[in-house]
């Protein structure tokens, strides 16, 4: 049987067998606790340059289909994939093939047959770190593989939004009669998931998806009723252009809504700083407290960076007073910020789910109400 190894930056090596394509994959080792939704995870641009370790013991049961991908063209964005027990066959009426066949087709190097729970315990205690998956002709002496892993770029300081963003603007039309829309939203693609424009479309909103390099002048030409900041990969401390753009949007009084990376961008625009978490939040059952209502929502999350702040913290900004609106019930991490006057708000989690619970989908309706109230 062929051999594959997962090599971590600190020298730990896990031995298994190839899964998917063979060769070499380098990235940051992170773990996802979702028991389902592996296709959505693999195609989420936020996982760019990361090797995802699945905590669920069996992966691939439902195969691969043409409907659940969260990237345009069904592109897999993870750098590599590590699983315990891949299902030998696909069992779902929508499946068009197996997970392994798709990994091979897209040349994603993976590893199977390793103690993924052991890897997760190691990452929980040591933190997410540089890693590599090696098989076939990429195998070498452990010292050489460790050197390759350590030589790669760190996620800290990585500016990745431009690598996953659309190169050209495109429009997602609203559901319903052609040419009829309630509002127009300018969505900045920092790694946007396809289910986000779908959520706008279901609410009768025309969504202009724009490159990460878009200027305020280009947004203003669209005369949007609101601006949306998407999820995405990398270190938000590097996204100075988007932060400056966000401040221009706030200064113009245009309603603004952000998700995940967009939450970190809005936080930075309001004066907060960011930091790299030890191992991040990646799963589909993470509880978040809304400090305005006291209610708890079960949320889908995927982030390794967060905003500095505390529950209910109020702070002054050039755009008026702001507050930390949401925090994680598990560890107190900031999960949302907003301007007190309501013109701009964001959350660290994913109300569009895909995969995950729909507890927070109402936030899209809140954004619609905000745009309606502005009367633009």
Curated annotation (Swiss-Prot):
Alphabetized Pfam families for the sequence: CPSase_sm_chain, GATase
Keywords: Amino-acid biosynthesis, Arginine biosynthesis, ATP-binding, Glutamine amidotransferase, Ligase, Nucleotide-binding, Pyrimidine biosynthesis
Active site: 260 (nucleophile), 350, 352
Keyword Amino-acid biosynthesis attributed: yes
UniProt record, GO biological process: 'de novo' pyrimidine nucleobase biosynthetic process; 'de novo' UMP biosynthetic process; glutamine metabolic process; L-arginine biosynthetic process
Region span, CPSase: 1-183
Alphabetical list of InterPro entries matching this protein: Anth_synth/Amidotransfase, CarbamoylP_synth_ssu, CarbamoylP_synth_ssu_N, CarbP_synth_ssu_N_sf, Class_I_gatase-like, CPSase_GATase1, GATASE
Residue ranges constituting the Glutamine amidotransferase type-1 domain according to the UniProt record: 184-376
Enzyme Commission number(s) from the entry: 6.3.5.5
UniProt pathway annotation: Amino-acid biosynthesis; L-arginine biosynthesis; carbamoyl phosphate from bicarbonate: step 1/1; Pyrimidine metabolism; UMP biosynthesis via de novo pathway; (S)-dihydroorotate from bicarbonate: step 1/3
UniProt-annotated binding residues for L-glutamine: 46, 232, 234, 261, 264, 302, 304-305
Molecular function in Gene Ontology: ATP binding; carbamoyl-phosphate synthase (glutamine-hydrolyzing) activity; glutaminase activity
Catalyses which reaction(s): hydrogencarbonate + L-glutamine + 2 ATP + H2O = carbamoyl phosphate + L-glutamate + 2 ADP + phosphate + 2 H(+)
Role of this protein: Small subunit of the glutamine-dependent carbamoyl phosphate synthetase (CPSase). CPSase catalyzes the formation of carbamoyl phosphate from the ammonia moiety of glutamine, carbonate, and phosphate donated by ATP, constituting the first step of 2 biosynthetic pathways, one leading to arginine and/or urea and the other to pyrimidine nucleotides. The small subunit (glutamine amidotransferase) binds and cleaves glutamine to supply the large subunit with the substrate ammonia.
Subunit structure: Composed of two chains; the small (or glutamine) chain promotes the hydrolysis of glutamine to ammonia, which is used by the large (or ammonia) chain to synthesize carbamoyl phosphate. Tetramer of heterodimers (alpha,beta)4.
Protein family according to the UniProt entry: Belongs to the CarA family.
NCBIfam families: CPSaseIIsmall (TIGR01368), PRK12838.1 (NF009475)
Protein name: Carbamoyl phosphate synthase small chain
Organism annotation: Mycobacterium bovis (strain ATCC BAA-935 / AF2122/97)
């Amino acid at each position: 049987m062929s051999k594959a190894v997962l090599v971590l930056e600190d020298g730990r090596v896990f031995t298994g067998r190839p899964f998917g394509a063979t060769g070499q994959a380098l990235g940051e080792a992170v773990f996802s606790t979702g028991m389902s939704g592996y296709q959505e995870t693999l195609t989420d641009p936020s996982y760019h340059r990361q090797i995802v370790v699945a905590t669920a013991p069996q992966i691939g049961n439902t195969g691969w289909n043409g409907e659940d991908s969260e990237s345009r063209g069904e592109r897999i964005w993870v750098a590599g994939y590590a699983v315990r027990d891949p299902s030998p066959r696909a069992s779902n009426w929508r499946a068009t093939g197996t997970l392994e066949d798709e990994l091979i087709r897209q040349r994603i190097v993976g590893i199977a047959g390793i103690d993924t729970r052991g890897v997760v315990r190691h990452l929980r205690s040591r933190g997410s770190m540089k890693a590599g998956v090696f098989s076939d002709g990429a195998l070498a002496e452990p010292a050489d593989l460790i050197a390759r892993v350590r030589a790669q770029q760190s996620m800290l300081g990585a500016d990745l939004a431009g690598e996953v963003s659309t190169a050209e603007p495109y429009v997602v039309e609203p559901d319903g009669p052609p040419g009829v829309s309630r509002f127009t939203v300018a969505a900045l693609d920092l790694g946007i998931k396809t289910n986000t424009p779908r959520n706008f479309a279901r609410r009768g909103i025309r969504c202009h998806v724009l490159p990460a390099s878009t200027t305020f002048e280009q947004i203003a030409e669209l005369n949007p009723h609101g601006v949306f900041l998407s999820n995405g990969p990398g270190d938000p401390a590097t996204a100075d252009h988007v932060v400056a753009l966000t401040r221009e949007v706030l200064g113009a009084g245009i309603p603004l809504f952000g998700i995940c990376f967009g939450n970190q961008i809005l936080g930075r625009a309001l004066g907060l700083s960011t930091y790299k978490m030890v191992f991040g939040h990646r799963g589909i059952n993470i509880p978040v407290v809304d400090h305005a209502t006291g209610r708890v929502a079960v949320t889908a999350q995927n982030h390794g960076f967060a905003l500095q702040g505390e529950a209910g913290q109020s702070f002054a900004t050039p755009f008026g007073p702001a507050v930390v609106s949401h925090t994680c019930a598990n560890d107190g991490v900031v999960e949302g910020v907003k301007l007190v006057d309501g013109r701009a708000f964001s959350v660290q989690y994913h109300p569009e789910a895909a995969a995950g619970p729909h507890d927070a989908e109402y936030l899209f309706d809140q954004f619609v109400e905000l745009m309606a109230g502005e009367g633009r």
